[in-house]
């Protein structure tokens, strides 16, 4: 029993650390803000080089610094508005109103820029859900195994071997990909195969990227992949080592061979290109990507900044403008923890490992 939880607690008065307790104490003692505390878990769970870089930027205060800059600008505008509340005989001059509006509009642009990193942040943290789809027996499972570098899915010459989705994660071109091998898409009366195709459709609906696989050595067949998908699609012309059928000669796609590895570099480049506008851009050694909680608060902050601008433009009473600015400040404070609630802290730190 020496060293056991019961022995330590009962004989020495120690208590077992709660999830995230060390990080929570660092936050409560002012050693880090809430964005940095969140980044601790992001660093631990990073699934790719870019995800780690974004987490490290946040841990170093990259997100918090931008929020603090926005807060300072808001306080500056609010101070001017409060002065007119304290001295009601003075009206806001056109020049002052113009300066304040310019500052608020600049803030709206910065908020919009931060909000645009939210989708990229999700892709970095969760990985790009990549569905491998196509007709039966075109080499979807072989593609999965080739990209993984080991045999994960059963491969055979019998069409319809894959009946259920198989999911694995890899890192490619600095990004985390969650590869999902799916059942072949075709019309079938087989109940089990129909269930597999239903799961395939579900995977396609939630995918961030679809790799449409075709057997380039055979004549082109009807495409059963759902046409209404919004996710980017990349056509993989597989089995090119067996020769390319005339039907595929003029079709744009990535020539690939699971047997020789041909086309892997082109696939990596195509994936980077497909998400070039979604992923956050690097600035020097920094990579800022907000999370869903930040996105929610920044969105609300932006709305209140917009309402404050409208209030000034309409020459409303400064009390209304001040109210919107205070609300905007509150939402910024929620991000860094300057304004916090136990519910928010509990939700964040409960996802940590014990201690940490």
Regions found by a protein language model. Give the residues of each.
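Short, small-residue-biased leader/transition segments that mark boundaries at the very start
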Residues: 1-8
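A common structural junction motif
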Residues: 9-17, 275
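A conserved P-loop NTPase coupling/switch region
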Residues: 17-49
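C-terminal-of-GTPase-core extension/linker across diverse P-loop GTPases
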Residues: 52-171, 188-190, 217-356
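Noncatalytic alpha-helical scaffolds and linker/capping helices
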Residues: 175-178, 183-187, 192-195
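Short, Asp-centered acidic motifs that coordinate Mg2+ and/or phosphate
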Residues: 177, 209, 234
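Generic enzyme active-site microenvironment
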Residues: 179, 213, 236
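Inter-motif core of Ras-like GTPase G domains
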Residues: 193-216
